[in-house]
Amino acid sequence: MSIKASGGSPLARPQLYRTASILTITQAEQQDRFLQLGELNQLVSFLNSGQKRLEVADILTKNANILVARAADKIFVGGSAISYLERPQAAVIIAGDQSSQDKINELSGNIQGDFGQSFRSLFNAGGATPPGFKPINVLRYGTTRMRKSLRDLDWFLRYLTYAIVSGDPNILSVNIRGLRELIDNACSSAAAIVALREMRRTALLIFEEDIKGQDLVKEYFNVVISEFEAPSLTDKLRKRISGDLQGLRLPQTYVQAGVSTPRFVMKPSLSADEKNIVVKACYRQIFERDIAKAYDLSLSNLESQVKNGQISIKEFIRSLGTSSIYRKQFYEPFVNSRALELAFRHFLGRGPSSLEEFQKYFAILSSTGLSGLVNALLNSSEYTDYFGEETVPYFRNLGEEPQECRNWGPQIDLLTYSAPFRKVPQFITLFSDYKQSLPDQHPYGIGNDPLSIQFGAIFPKENKDPRKRQALFGKDTRRILVRRGPGIYNQISNPQVRPKSAGSLGPKIFKLSNALIKSDSSQNFENSVEVVTKVAYLRVFGREVYQEEKLILKPIESQLKDNQITVREFVRQLAKSSIFRSLYWEPLYICKAIEYIHNRLLGRPTYGRQEINKYFDIAYKQGYYQVIDTIIDSSEYTETFGDNTVPYERYSTPAGVALRSLRPGIIDQRFKKVIASKSARFVELGTVKEMRSSNDIQSRISQGVTSLRDQSIVFEVNSDSNKEMLEQALRAAYRQIFERDLNSFSVGGEFLDIKSAFLNRQICVKELVEKLALSELYGKEFYQPYPNTKVIELGTKHILGRAPNNQAEIRFFNQILASKGLSAFISNLVESVEYNAVYGKDTVPYRRFPTLPAANFPNTETLYNRLTKQDISIVVPSFKKVLGNQ
């Protein structure tokens, strides 16, 4: 396998054991259904017995020392075995509880030299003694082995309590099966069996008066002993038929610990409900959802055939894979490479294993299409071996069978729920990376390289680009770093030029020279120290320090000014300060923190794993301060900066160099660079460039303003209005609402009643407008012939005297029209805050924006100048799409 690429290592947490609740819920979740009555009863039974289980586990924990002591005395002679039990592993005994300690001593007994009595006690315990058992002498066995043996006995008891609390003996089966061979290699498994039986007998005596507790303890102790006596399980092998595929094995404990994927098999003897469950499992595997439940879709013809036994499950899967639903969901939206990966997921329950396998099926997909790929997968010998004719395909993921390491990451990602949302192919990209050289990035991920900017430790996020690629860097792999200055001064090819300055091609170097220190001009020296101090702050912290932080660093500055410490020691103290540590050590991962510190203090990133692993080891074993000392006391720091030079950047990554430079290749050449003007654009455009006369100015002032503004008449009714004025207001209301005068038409009694009520002052102008708009004539002329959007435009024109303000207003009134009808729409307009503020109760509505300026003047102008009966098109608002306008 190539060492130049890696499939990555996504977070995988294989299940270590099962519990009663996890097993029940997971099985229902895998089948996409609710819990059945029997499963609910199991959960109820488990929860009801929870208090009893906790009580039994608590009693066993409190008597752990007694149980371990009796078991140890059963197999050890010639000393006090319980004394070898390490306190952190044992049950806690309350200090001063002399009765508990006396009971342990009483149960342990003084068996030093009473070998015969201990040997005879074996035959009084009940049960056959395992063949090959001999009591073990404590002194000959040794202190180290005694501690391990007592630790193991305590371990058995602790895991017994875990299983009792979880309600499932699976944790015992997973962890105890196979220990017999391991203990046989160290001491004697027969002695362990005797000790476990004695522990069981003592525990049953403790629960002698509690029948339920005794049954519970006996059940789980029997599992412990039976699993220990049973032979270890063989590994689960995954044989391959091709030389380019990996042969793999998986320990059976992983299979036992997890919840196995359910197998759905179609049999003629199944009931109708069971056959429906199998069909739904096919839908979930191929379409990743139950299409009958989610979209109310079903392939009734195929379903009836598979239920009646006319076609097998394999042929049913073939029909689903070649259906139009599958084609639209998992073939047409993707490129062929990704469609191939998803087909492997759906029909074989795994991802492509090798480049050769990928090329084989990619050629089939390219030449014969989706149907050819589905047929090739279903006709393969692998499908026949795993699923046959009657079994629904299932995911062969982690815990189900061994996984390949070369496509570990993409395989786990492919079997997740979000796989269809990823458009970029993973496997072919990984397989191509096997043959490519290593990328130029940090050995522990590109996200560990700080961005090459001045301020602080800013690291790029790797989760923004889904096409991230991992690479397997070896310890001897070294990164390519770009030298600041002439390439001939690179320290890899020429280490002797480390202290040599790069001159004008390199960074600015600040150095506190000895000549300046010895100078008589103290003023120059003070200025020099201030400059060096400020530059050191910028280099180490990435920014200037705050006033409160300066108070903390003041003593260190004073020592530098008094020539008590060198610049090198000054940098060391800054890196060890609480300010630096709180910024760039405590909140970051160790890898990122070391990379930042190394870059700031030595002026370059790390070369590779070999260098950064050294700092990992120092940080773990000796702490943070030793990491700083190791960097500053290194020969590279001494040769490059000496004692009086502030560290500066010497090397950068290629990505950092590209980040700082503006290359012509990345600039869009279609547009010329726009030079920003010094003055605002509206000032420049508004500047008068020619001489204007007074007549010219007057004509420009009146530009766009017509006589409509001066000629507009507002009809208002008050207490002094006579009958003639009331009739004028009534006719104005007719013209505003119906866009014409109604006197020349024969109208029914509805308008006569409204006219009479208004002239007799029984209703106000506002009520008059509402009654006119709610009349049958208005609905016939302005509501029934038009769509809702046009009705809204006409309603705002007639009642509010303007066009709609924006799309949000149209959408609001559209909801009212659709749900409550015309009457609610008219009432909402008349009772609106805008109507009351503009017209009140006694003013007839009128056109409010006859001339500029007005925000919706263009729409209002178009709406009023258009003949309603001759043009039924909708006036579209001319506002831009901005927040609040949509």
Curated annotation (Swiss-Prot):
Recorded hits in CDD domains, A to Z, give: PBP_PBS-LCM (cd12128)
Q: Which PROSITE patterns does the entry mention?
A: PBS_LINKER
Q: Which residues form the PBS-linker domain?
A: 244-424, 496-678, 695-876
Q: Which GO terms describe its biological process?
A: photosynthesis
A single MF term (Gene Ontology)? lyase activity
**Per the UniProt record, which EC number(s) apply here?**
4.-.-.-
The alphabetical list of record keywords is: Antenna complex, Bile pigment, Chloroplast, Chromophore, Electron transport, Lyase, Membrane, Photosynthesis, Phycobilisome, Plastid, Repeat, Thylakoid, Transport
Q: Which InterPro entries match?
A: Globin-like_sf (IPR009050), PBS_linker_dom (IPR001297), PBS_linker_sf (IPR038255), Phycobilisome_asu/bsu (IPR012128), Phycobilisome_asu/bsu_sf (IPR038719)
Q: Which Gene3D superfamilies does the UniProt entry name for this protein?
A: Phycobilisome linker domain, Phycocyanins
Asked if the keyword Lyase belongs to this entry, the reply reads: yes
Classify the protein's membrane topology as the record does.
Answer: Peripheral membrane protein
Positions binding (2R,3E)-phycocyanobilin in this chain are C187
Q: How is it modified after translation?
A: Contains one covalently linked bilin chromophore. This protein autochromophorylates (Potential).
Task: Give GO cellular component annotations, separated by semicolons.
Answer: chloroplast thylakoid membrane; phycobilisome
**What top-tier enzyme class does this entry carry?**
lyase
Subcellular locations according to the entry: Plastid, Chloroplast thylakoid membrane
A Pfam family reported for this protein in Swiss-Prot or TrEMBL: PBS_linker_poly
Family membership noted in the UniProt record: Belongs to the phycobilisome linker protein family.
Q: What does this protein do?
A: This protein is postulated to act both as terminal energy acceptor and as a linker polypeptide that stabilizes the phycobilisome architecture. May have intrinsic bilin lyase activity.
Q: What is the name listed in the Swiss-Prot or TrEMBL entry for this protein? A: Phycobiliprotein ApcE
Q: Which organism is it from?
A: Pyropia yezoensis (Susabi-nori)
Q: Which gene encodes it?
A: apcE
